[in-house]
Amino acid sequence: RAALEALASVKQPADMALIQNVVRALYLPWLDASARHFQGLIDGAENAVRAKVTGSQHEKDSCLMFADGLRYDVAGMLAERLEAKGYRVRLSHRLAPLPTVTSTAKPFATLSHDKLEGGEDIVDFNPRFKNSPQAANAQRLRDDMASRGIDLLGEDIRPGKQGSTGGWLETGKLDELGHKLGARLAAQIDTELEILLDQVAGLIEAGWTRIRIVTDHGWL
């Protein structure tokens, strides 16, 4: 969080480059050591790790709100803002499928995760539907959720809550902005958090009394 605040505090290219170098010097050795340690822990224990990977939990009558690239510390910042507005909030984590890229982790964050599987022959790390050669792309996932009676919601159009099976909303541009802006994404965090807050408020106004916010991966 201190690194994000430092990067967000400067605007001039020279200042940004200086802060980036400092952050890199401090964090890169730790990140590298952490990644290698994690690899060592799972080496030879892939089946045990796979068994610990779970999809997003979902309660009846609740809306699952997928926020792309909502890194854990940024999720903590969102939780603080939600609490400040009087919402009851609980922050938790789960083990994501590997590799933690959108094509792998996002499908398991959906309400269709129980129908998905991996495999050595999958393409571009994209899981497929069980007993099917079909990759779990965005449209097939939405079609499957719709067949279960899930309300599929748009970012801007917020219809009133329809059924009691649950809802699904995709929102957030942290991942997209990160690819475009690089380290300058830090200056956009506040704006993106406010957008997520507005989405939560809109869902509540539409009749959703419980919202679970999930994501696919973080970023460096």
What is the predicted role of each segment?
Residues 1-63, 69-220:
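…; additionally, a secondary subgroup of soluble metalloenzymes is captured
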